[in-house]
Regions:
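N-terminal signal peptide c-region/cleavage motif recognized by signal peptidases
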Residues: 14-18
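Positively charged n-region of N-terminal signal peptides that target proteins for export
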Residues: 1-7
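Edge beta-strand at a domain terminus
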Residues: 104-125
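Short, hydrophobic/aromatic-rich segments at coil-to-beta transitions
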Residues: 20-27, 47-50, 67-76, 92-96
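Contiguous, well-ordered beta-strand patches that form the walls/edges
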Residues: 56-88
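N-terminal glycine/threonine-rich, aromatic-flanked beta-hairpin/loop signature
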Residues: 40-61, 94-106
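Short, solvent-exposed loop/hinge segments that bridge or flank secondary-structure elements
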Residues: 23-48, 78-90
Length: 125
């Protein structure tokens, strides 16, 4: 009976940890001077990363599948003209965007220091 109860407790603890959402909000205001309100949302449970900037329009507002590695989180956004790779270093919280242009065969990188921020309090869900 004790083993059954112990097993049930361990199972419940495991299920409760799975139910906890692993969403991290990062404020990264220095990646693009036109987007000082840039928020990066890393959703580990769904395996996605979102960039949200109300002031920027559609250029920096997107969600993409992300890889959550032990030292960094990476994702990409490709268009006809550009291939962009984003990464966040888990230790330093530095966001890096590397853009490759097929037309000019050049690569350009930008970085921004980020801070962990809280989700907006007015959100109901």
């Amino acid at each position: 009976m004790k083993n059954l109860l112990l097993g049930l407790c361990i199972s419940l603890i495991g299920f409760s940890s799975l139910a906890t959402a692993k969403i991290t909000y990062l404020s990264c205001p220095y990646l693009d001077e036109r987007a000082p309100d840039l928020i990066v949302v890393l959703d580990q449970n769904n395996g996605s990363a979102s960039l949200q900037s109300p002031s920027m329009g559609s250029g920096l507002n997107f969600t993409a599948p992300a890889a959550f590695g032990p030292s960094e989180v990476t994702w990409r956004k490709d268009s006809k003209k550009y291939k962009q790779t984003y990464s966040v270093d888990r230790a330093t919280l530095v966001l890096k965007r590397t853009t490759y242009s097929e037309m000019s065969n050049t690569t350009h990188s930008e970085v921004s220091d980020c801070k962990i921020s809280k989700p907006p309090k007015q959100n109901k869900f």
